[in-house]
From Swiss-Prot:
This is Triosephosphate isomerase. It is found in: Cytoplasm. It comes from Leptospira interrogans serogroup Icterohaemorrhagiae serovar copenhageni (strain Fiocruz L1-130). Gene3D superfamilies: Aldolase class I (3.20.20.70). Pathway: Carbohydrate biosynthesis; gluconeogenesis; Carbohydrate degradation; glycolysis; D-glyceraldehyde 3-phosphate from glycerone phosphate: step 1/1. The keyword Cytoplasm applies. NCBIfam families: tim.
Length: 250
């Protein structure tokens, strides 16, 4: 049975004081209401250690928004998985639309990260999704297929148990356009089928992978989304940055 996951992406938001306050609030409230859902938070890199210490021993998992695919080395400005392990972080987000769009991260670059992280016993949250122009030109499935096949190329089947996917309809974020639960379900179903075709025996593996929806998830739409067969949770931005709205997702 697939896990239902609510993952809060704090992005480059919150001061240290705000992040610490939110982490304490999450520790106090979320474990008691999460029930059968897995809760995750992804603070900014500078706040990871503080938040990890606060949530240590709770059911809330702390993840990193990014890292580089290398051990300790001369990569100025980057963070190594080795450094993340030191502070208890074992989940890393890869391929978020903002990193693809603004920092030029390609499917192949994401693949390098994913393979390195999985081999080093991390769980990976891999984000895929199409832009507004790609959707309006009818390229949604083509784009997603490339992101899945190129991003997950060469990954051994034994590592797929540590893989989570998230679908981000970039066209529905900050554009005034809204993806309906049925539109999201259609794409999630396609993603699952694409995974099932990656290698022999992948069909059963694809059925066990949680696929989250990441298009402006809020307390007032989460339940309708979760009713869909292939939507297994949410990758949440703004609503995860206040305890009232984050708690409303559970």
């Amino acid at each position: 049975m697939r896990k239902t996951i609510i993952a809060g992406n704090w992005k480059m938001n919150l001061s240290l004081k705000e992040a610490v306050f939110l982490a304490h609030s999450i520790r106090e409230k979320i474990p008691s209401i999460s029930k059968d859902k897995v809760s995750m938070v992804f603070p900014s890199t500078l706040h990871l250690e503080n938040v990890s210490k606060i949530l240590e021993g709770s059911s809330v998992i702390v993840g990193a928004q990014n890292c580089y695919h290398s051990g300790l080395a001369a990569f100025t400005g980057e963070t190594s998985p080795d450094q993340l392990k030191e502070i208890g972080v074992k989940v890393v987000m890869v391929g978020h639309s903002e990193r693809r769009q603004f920092l030029g991260e390609s499917n192949f670059f994401c693949n390098d990260k994913i393979r390195f992280l999985l081999k080093n016993e991390f769980t990976v949250l891999y984000c895929v999704g199409e832009t507004l122009s790609e959707r309006e030109s009818g390229k949604t499935l083509e784009v997603l297929s490339s992101q899945i096949r190129e991003g997950l190329k060469g990954i051994d089947s034994v590592f797929f148990s540590n893989l989570i996917l998230a679908y981000e309809p970039v066209w529905a974020i900050g554009t005034g356009k809204v993806a309906t639960p049925s539109q999201a379900q259609e794409v999630h179903s396609f993603i699952r089928k694409e995974i099932s075709g990656l290698f022999v025996g992948a069909s059963s593996i694809s059925e066990s992978i949680s696929i989250l929806y990441g298009g402006s998830v809020k307390p007032d739409n989460i339940q309708d989304l979760l009713k869909e067969k292939d939507i297994d949770g949410g990758l949440v931005g703004g609503a995860s940055q206040k305890i009232s709205s984050f708690a409303g997702l559970f």
